[in-house]
Swiss-Prot record:
The gene is Ggta1. PANTHER family: GLYCOSYLTRANSFERASE-RELATED (PTHR10462), N-ACETYLLACTOSAMINIDE ALPHA-1,3-GALACTOSYLTRANSFERASE (PTHR10462:SF26). It is found in: Golgi apparatus, Golgi stack membrane. One of its GO terms (molecular function) is glycosyltransferase activity. It catalyses: a beta-D-galactosyl-(1->4)-N-acetyl-beta-D-glucosaminyl derivative + UDP-alpha-D-galactose = an alpha-D-galactosyl-(1->3)-beta-D-galactosyl-(1->4)-N-acetyl-beta-D-glucosaminyl derivative + UDP + H(+). It comes from Rattus norvegicus. The lineage of its organism: Eukaryota, Metazoa, Chordata, Craniata, Vertebrata. Glycans are attached at residue 296. Dorsal root ganglia neurons (at protein level). Expressed in the heart, brain, spleen, kidney, lung and liver. This is N-acetyllactosaminide alpha-1,3-galactosyltransferase.
Length: 371
């Protein structure tokens, strides 16, 4: 049996004590580290959860606010306190006229009497302080036969309560009739070159309108209508007709099928529309829109007219044929029912509730030099 010296025994004991203390300290440090890591994880989870909860509440609250804003906007629109443009279904109710076609395949409205909310539209456009232009051409004997009636009736019924500028194109401005205009209405008269044939007068108006839009009309009006002079207003032609690109259904063809329409059918013409194509037959006696849209329309139509002249061909219905070709590929954003340009020679069917404009008697033998 080996006897360990006392001082060595003390050293060994002290060494063991230090080792055990070091081991305990190491274990304690590890546990603290583990606790710290767990604490950080728990804290991170809590923070992420808090962020998610806050984000969820924000999204829902934002959505709620958006719904409230929409509802407030609707209420303001109903009360006339907003200048936000009314949406189609705010002012247009096609169900009021189930017996007629009221919406095109491309979802544009066809405006009939009873389908629109006049009061709502008037509130909006009155606050917009719009100006509407109206071009009309009167040459030769058309001046004495039609111009005065057209202007006097337009002054009474066209865009009542809004600023209007009548642009009158004449080949002899000295024959301009005296017309008393309403306070919000003004008149600009321009002299244009006389043409030998009425067909050329009809077609050249596209060029003339385009030139005047570029020169001054685009800076003067918000909307522009172009109309034939041989017709007369009979009732309000109001803001329900305004749109970016507005077309007029031709009274004689609004119930016909496209293959029956008198489109230009000769392939050589720029106005050619083949059988099996087409939507409606549009009347060149009334069309309108914003100045930029009318500028594009007149440019394209006149381009087609010039192309036909190069090929020594003339479209069947002149500028109207080219107008129909344009609308085939540039769909109108709004269409006016035949009530807005009606021919009483057809009679008065039950679906024609309120005639806005009526054709005048076509005395071609008196007003045209080459019938």
């Amino acid at each position: 049996m080996v006897t360990m010296p006392q001082d060595l025994h003390v050293k060994v004991s002290m060494s063991r004590s230090k080792s055990e203390t070091s081991l305990l300290s190491s274990r304690s440090g590890s546990q603290e580290k583990i606790m710290n890591v767990k604490g950080k994880i728990i804290l991170s989870v809590l923070m992420v959860s808090t962020v998610l909860v806050v984000f969820w509440e924000y999204v829902n609250r934002t959505h709620s606010y958006q719904e409230e804003d929409i509802e407030r906007a609707r209420e303001k629109g109903r009360n006339g306190d907003s200048i936000v443009e009314p949406q189609l279904w705010d002012w247009f109710n096609p169900k009021n006229r189930p017996e007629v076609l009221t919406v095109t395949p491309w979802k544009a409205p066809i405006v009939w009497e009873g389908t629109y909310d006049t009061a709502l539209l008037e509130k909006y456009y009155a606050r917009q302080k719009i100006t509407v232009g109206l071009t009309v051409f009167a040459v030769g004997k058309y001046i004495e036969h039609y111009l005065e009636d057209f202007l006097e009736s337009a002054n009474k019924y066209f865009m009542v309560g809004h600023r209007v500028i009548f642009y009158v194109m004449m080949d002899d401005t000295s024959r301009m009739p005296a017309v008393h205009l309403s306070p919000l209405h003004s008149l600009q008269v321009f002299e244009i070159r006389s043409e030998k044939r009425w067909q050329d007068i009809s077609m050249m108006r596209m060029k003339t309108i385009g030139e005047h839009i570029l020169d001054h009309i685009q800076h003067e009006v918000d909307f522009l209508f172009c109309m034939d002079v041989d017709q007369v207003f009979q009732d309000n032609f109001g803001v329900e007709t305004l749109g970016q690109l507005v077309a007029q259904l031709q009274a004689w063809w609004y119930k016909a099928s496209p293959d029956e329409f008198t489109y230009e059918r000769r392939e050589l013409s720029a106005a050619y529309i083949p059988f099996g194509e087409g939507d409606f037959y549009y009347h060149a006696a009334v069309f309108g829109g914003t100045p930029v849209h009318i500028l594009n329309l007149t440019r394209e139509c006149f381009k087609g007219i010039l192309q036909d002249k190069k090929h020594d061909i003339e479209a069947q219905w002149h500028d109207e044929s080219h107008l129909n070709k344009y609308f085939l590929f540039n769909k109108p954003t709004k269409i006016l029912s035949p009530e807005y340009c009606w021919d009483y020679h057809i009679g008065l069917p039950s679906d024609i509730k309120n005639v806005k404009i009526a054709w005048q008697t076509k005395e071609y033998n008196l007003v045209r030099s080459n019938v």
